Amino acid sequence: MKLEVLPLDQKTFSAYGDVIETQEREFFHINNGLVERYHDLAKVEVLEQDRTLISINRAQPAAMPIVVHELERHPLGTQAFVPMNGEAFVVIVALGDDKPDLSTLRAFISNGRQGVNYHRNVWHHPLFAWQTVTDFLTVDRGGSDNCDVESIPTHELCFA
């Protein structure tokens, strides 16, 4: 099956998470007016006994064509990825309770100046780079195991 890749924007991505970007976002000045602060762009969630982690993930480019055969989710916390050097990247997401609802399966490509924050329990493809090795600033939870993985029928990404 083919899965069309759409441009990433907050309106079409909102059911799955937050788009982390400055475009069309409110800001205020700090540090004597030298800094524009784009405040509270994503909601980070962890359970009370867990803690928030900041990491860097170095992702390798996926082999082309990109074939999707599994999704994962994190029921105990959100997970954010922000490319550190302006690289575009692809995210693949779906809603669903115990298993991914394939009628909600979507793929998005960022513009290189956007990151994503997946809501808790949102099914998504494991992180990968698109065209080049990419470092991602990653914000997620530390604690016990927090990853459910489900196989799905194979889908091939189709770039419009």
Swiss-Prot record:
GO terms for molecular function: ureidoglycolate hydrolase activity; ureidoglycolate lyase activity. Keywords: Lyase, Purine metabolism. The keyword Cell membrane does not apply. Pathway: Nitrogen metabolism; (S)-allantoin degradation. The keyword Lyase applies. It comes from the Bacteria. It catalyses: (S)-ureidoglycolate = urea + glyoxylate. CDD domains: cupin_UAH (cd20298). Its cofactor is Ni(2+). Transmembrane segments: none annotated. It holds the Pfam family Ureidogly_lyase. GO terms for biological process: allantoin catabolic process; purine nucleobase catabolic process. Its EC number is 4.3.2.3. Belongs to the ureidoglycolate lyase family. Homodimer. Catalyzes the catabolism of the allantoin degradation intermediate (S)-ureidoglycolate, generating urea and glyoxylate. Involved in the utilization of allantoin as nitrogen source. This is Ureidoglycolate lyase. It comes from Salmonella typhimurium (strain LT2 / SGSC1412 / ATCC 700720). The lineage of its organism: Bacteria, Pseudomonadati, Pseudomonadota, Gammaproteobacteria, Enterobacterales.
